[in-house]
Regions:
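Extended basic (Lys/Arg/His-rich) segments that typically form rRNA-contacting surfaces
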Residues: 1-205
């Protein structure tokens, strides 16, 4: 089961063979050198470690530079482990977009766009209150519990707070096109995170 790191370049649209227009997200996927292999015998679990994203040496620690140099990789900013994805890979090999096929289903994980502190209407899609007749609670959350009983706010009550900037995984996304020459992967629909954000792409079994 292949996995790869990618950078979200943005969205566009392509014409399919039947003439329909499909909106797609363009990902710059790889190349990702293999910088580590985890085994059950030595580490207690199976995983492959991939690196991605060119970086200057001054932005990496000596430990990071030493680890990458030992694997024969250039200075790279992002190092991520993928559980149960090692397969036949060895340290020093490179994973490219050619490990995937058009029409394949993948799941993509990334950090969603941060929205800051937001109220319940934007954060949880609550209905707004009355907007006329002197109402003062157009965007108020409403009751969060009675005073006599339960005399407290119950666990799990949705309220205002930090919105976004969390790890999100979208499943069942279809690969529409691949361009191995430019390391591009076109995925149907949207992908978590901002433009130029780094995402993890795995096959969706």
């Amino acid at each position: 089961m292949p996995a790869i790191l990618a950078k979200k370049l943005g969205m566009t649209q392509v014409f399919l063979e039947d003439g329909k227009v499909e909106r797609v997200t363009v990902l710059e996927a790889g190349p990702c050198p293999v910088t580590g292999i985890r085994t059950i015998e030595r580490d207690g679990y199976e995983a492959v470690q991939l690196a991605f994203g060119a970086s200057k040496e001054k932005h990496l620690s000596k430990a990071e530079l030493g680890h990458l140099k030992k694997a024969g990789a250039p200075p790279l900013r992002h190092v991520v482990e993928f559980r149960d994805e090692a397969g036949e890979l060895q340290v020093g090999e490179t994973v490219t977009v050619e490990a995937f096929e058009a029409g394949q289903r993948v799941k993509i994980s990334g950090t969603s766009k941060g929205k800051g502190f937001q109220g319940t209407i934007k954060r949880h899609n609550f209905a707004s209150g009355p907007k006329s007749h002197g109402s003062h609670n157009k965007r108020a959350p409403g009751s969060i519990g009675a005073s006599a009983w339960p005399a407290r706010v119950m666990k799990g009550i949705r309220g205002p707070g930090q919105m976004g900037n969390k790890r999100v995984t979208q499943k069942g996304l279809e690969i529409v096109q691949l361009d191995p020459q430019q390391n591009l992967m076109l995925v149907r629909g949207s992908v978590p995170g901002p433009r130029n954000g780094v995402v993890e792409v795995r096959t969706d079994a």
